[in-house]
Amino acid sequence: MASILTNSSALTALQTLASTNKSLESTQNRISTGLRISEASDNASYWSIATSMKSDNKANSAVQDALGLGAGKVDTAYSAINKIRESVDDIKTKLVSAMGASTEDKGKIETEIKSIVANINSALSNANYAGSNLLNGPTTDLNVVASYNRSGNAVAVDKITVKATDTDAKTMVKDIVDAGFFTSASDDTAIGTALNTVETALASLATGAATLGAAKSQIDSQKSFLSGLQDSIEKGVGTLVDADMNKESARLSALQVQQQLGVQALSIANSSNQSILSLFRG
């Protein structure tokens, strides 16, 4: 039925065009942002999950930074304590050479040992990283944040701890660097006592190096694990919220065609009133 009051065809065409325009706007937004779900109204459940995962990954990034800083401190101490251990081992060799040596030769050995002791003191002082020295008389344990775990609303932060007493190389070599440890006047008995002191220091330094080596390995392993975890979480977030650009591009082309057809349909529907007017022309 033709009516001059209500154009049903035009109303239908208008509704179809409005729906197409809305879909087109949504598709254009997905293409411009690269996201299928960019806000809670798109999909509240997926948006909430993705938001929590992104937050966890930010925390993991902070943990990575802490691990990097901790690795620097441990690596520096590990390198230095091994140099100190090698120096003490050199002193051991010098002391063995001093057994039964002449006073003149002992004087030369004394000079060499003093030079090695100076190197030990230098290594102790320079084993510093970001204001932290794990060898030169540390007073507090090193705690490195290693992981961030969330279960519901409960959060747990795990740490890798290096005890100060296990890495205090200054105390380990104290009896060696003290003045008078070895002099050209030392007899074989005194040299034997000095060798016992050296052996004790070497054992302590080996334990300290093992402690730092274990911490170094643990930190490196955790850094690698955390890097993989971050990648997995990022992929998971992408699966939830990222738009498939191939599909969206194809959808955009189809909707643009639908929009053009909708405009034409509306134009045709509006022209129907002109045919009614022609009925009254002479």
Curated annotation (Swiss-Prot):
Disulfide bonds: none annotated. Gene3D superfamilies: f41 fragment of flagellin, N-terminal domain. InterPro entries: Flagellin, Flagellin_C, Flagellin_N. Pfam families: Flagellin_C, Flagellin_N. Keywords: Bacterial flagellum, Secreted. It is found in: Secreted; Bacterial flagellum. Induction: Expressed at the onset of the exponential phase (after 4, 8 and 12 hours of culture) but not at later time points. Disruption phenotype: A fliC mutant is attenuated in a murine model of infection. As the infection progresses, the number of cfu per spleen from mice infected with the mutant is significantly lower than the number from mice infected with the wild-type. Its main location: secreted. One of its GO terms (cellular component) is bacterial-type flagellum. GO terms for molecular function: structural molecule activity. Belongs to the bacterial flagellin family. PANTHER family: FLAGELLIN. Flagellin is the subunit protein which polymerizes to form the filaments of bacterial flagella. The flagellum is required to cause a persistent disease in a murine model of infection. This is Flagellin.
